[in-house]
Amino acid sequence: MRQPLLKLAAVTRRFPAGDKDVVVLNNVNLSIGAGEIVAIVGASGSGKSTLMNILGCLDHPSEGTYTVGGRDTHMLDSDELAQLRREHFGFVFQRYHLLPHVDAVANLEMPAIYAGTPRADRHARARELLARLGLADRAHHRPGQLSGGQQQRVSIARALMNGGQVILADEPTGALDTKSGQDVIRILHELNALGHTIVIVTHDKAVARHARRIIEISDGEIVADRPNRHYAEAFAEVGVGAAATTETAADTRSAPASGDAPPPANNDTAADPAPRARRFAAGTGRFAEACRMAWIALVSHRLRTLLTMLGIIIGITSVVSIVAVGEGAKRYMLEEIGSIGTNTISLYPGSDWGDSRADTIQTLVPADVAALAEQPYVDSATPETSRTLLLRYRNVDVHALVSGVGDSYFQTRGMRFALGVPFDDDAVRRQAQVAVIDQNTRRKLFGATRNPVGEAILVDNVPCVVIGVTADKKSAFGSVKSLNVWVPYTTASGRLFGQRYLDSITVRVRDGQPSAAAEKSLEKLMIQRHGRKDFFTYNMDSVVKTVEKTGQSLTLLLSLIAVISLVVGGIGVMNIMLVSVTERTREIGIRMAVGARQSDILQQFLVEAVLVCLLGGTIGIALSFGLGALFSVFVAQWKMVFSAGAIVTAFVCSTLTGVIFGFMPARNASRLDPIDALARD
């Protein structure tokens, strides 16, 4: 004797109601064979819908066992139950349960998506089913554009999408007019004639008489289970004939043979590359569908989506802009430091800044400069000595800082010339009476427009010819107001100051040489020359590192403030997603009923949250570039610098925000009970 396809043994179903449990099904024993057409009849509250939910693996018994093709459903996990619903059951609901925001084809494709059917195959299958059920011209109509009878036919077509070995019809004619109801009953008869097992749940005995077997249920117990003596008459009434059956045959694609049982899940295909490839393709298809449905959901609620993204937009704009401002400021500061001489080491007499004995130390001499310049790690070395002296040109007298320097001083300091040229080594050797002045000195002595090159000025009563004028330097540290004059250090020592020692020596380290190692080497050399350490060094590299570290700290601080905005935006995403889950509870139930796994639902809502954040992140980055363009218009000195790393970080942050703040709503959605979800309005 062939085992029944569906079998309930001593099944009891209880639901908690306050401090007590309400028994909805009590010790139900029922067997349904493959290929039967059965009607379960009962009044409202009799337990017939709960029985159908258990038969369709949407619910589970509190006690007893339910087997499908010999497989005990109690031993199956949620994914295996979803597989049963997806591959062997088809549901026809009284309220149709179609997704309102997609067309008929998309509603039909849903079970096939979760079954991993390729897009082209499932699309062709959906259009074929609609054509067989007389809805070819309604394929791209949404449910709201269809009549009740048409919606129910779409529901039947969806039940057949994956084969539909067992069709569970819950009050299939309850919301239809008489003509549409007869059409639905006729279709169910045709499907049964092709080998589908049909279970009709109804309170209407006129509908029940279309089944070969009628099962009556009352107060959770089966009170009658008898064959229907009027089945032949009912069969003839709806006009089901051989022609109709043949016409529908191609539609169902040979439903499983009446004796076939659902095959057990196969977990031993991991080593076989073909199933692995199919699983990968199916997973990719489900992910693509999740992205498509997420986009449809976002577009369907444009204003809410925009408001949800607003926090992410502000957060990403803040993060990217602050990083760009910080990077631009750092580069500008380093350029400014470079203008006063980067990769340089200066030597001063004494032990440190403010040493009271520094004025009495006279050991820094021109010979030290020559010795340092010969070192392999040194690019150039220049001496420096300075005094404040009186300058005179015609009837104009001013005080200026007069510095005696070497010919490489201007290169070492990164100074540029507006007029004329610097003095050379020959001028230093000859103690030439030549001078280079800055723009402040030019304006004081000659005015802003007159060319001073070739003019003679008195420097503390020593005549000097102006041979060059340095260019103005706009500095982040403020513009320099002092007057500066540079003469050869030999001229300063022999003709102006009357001193043979130097105030300082500046060494420029060769490119590629480590500044710290060079500093140690020159200290060692100078100690050997002087016999003791009567000097200290000042390495500009330490200033650069300090500026970089300060810039990084400031950028980090401001970025943390911006991240707070991003977190607030993420909380907004989570709130809206929780609302979305509540609003779309029935959709979740529909997806679970047609075979969606918990992971599919989790993926659906997680993708939606990530998509919101990615869109917000993209808009935020675009706004940052717009702010950068405006910034360059109003701030001429320096620009915001956008790096690829900052942009990638922004996308990563927006994605992580979607994952982190979208996970809880998505998890809540995946954990919904299918029955509770379907019952929500």
UniProtKB/Swiss-Prot annotation:
It is a multi-pass membrane protein. One of its GO terms (cellular component) is plasma membrane. SMART domains: AAA. The keyword Aminoacyl-tRNA synthetase does not apply. It is an enzyme of class 7 (translocase). Non-canonical ABC transporter that contains transmembrane domains (TMD), which form a pore in the inner membrane, and an ATP-binding domain (NBD), which is responsible for energy generation. Confers resistance against macrolides. Belongs to the ABC transporter superfamily. Macrolide exporter (TC 3.A.1.122) family. This is Macrolide export ATP-binding/permease protein MacB. It comes from Burkholderia cenocepacia (strain HI2424). The gene is macB.
